[in-house]
Amino acid sequence: MLTDPIADMLTRIRNAHLALHKEVSVPRSKMKEALAAILKEEGYITDFKMEESSIVIELKYFKGKPVISGLKRISKSGRRVYVGSTDIPRVQNGLGICILSTSSGVLEGTNARSKNVGGELLCEIW
């Protein structure tokens, strides 16, 4: 049993990128589906496929190097981090994204800011 499934997903993506794998499989959940959709929308992964009990994420590379250079879990199971709409951080001076769990669903930081909603700061990706 995993205590932090989102951290597990981020770690699997990080490890697969370091090993230059084409794709990685993570256990399926609605939260992970939403995270994968945001990663695809923002151009950090090529695509993702839903299987019966897993999500297969196709990783993206540019000139042989991973598009994702860093992943960081912010809100953890032992220490939750909540931010208001005005306190949503800019990641790497605007070169990265932060992902929040809000009352409007899982959103990328700029979308949450434009909708004027805050929430739990899940992770940063750059």
From Swiss-Prot:
Signal peptide: none
Function: One of the primary rRNA binding proteins, it binds directly to 16S rRNA central domain where it helps coordinate assembly of the platform of the 30S subunit.
Gene (UniProt): rpsH
Originating organism: Oleidesulfovibrio alaskensis (strain ATCC BAA-1058 / DSM 17464 / G20)
Keywords: Ribonucleoprotein, Ribosomal protein, RNA-binding, rRNA-binding
NCBIfam families associated with the record: PRK00136.1
UniProt family annotation: Belongs to the universal ribosomal protein uS8 family.
Descriptive protein name: Small ribosomal subunit protein uS8
Pfam families: Ribosomal_S8
Subunit structure: Part of the 30S ribosomal subunit. Contacts proteins S5 and S12.
Stored Gene3D superfamilies: 3.30.1370.30, 3.30.1490.10
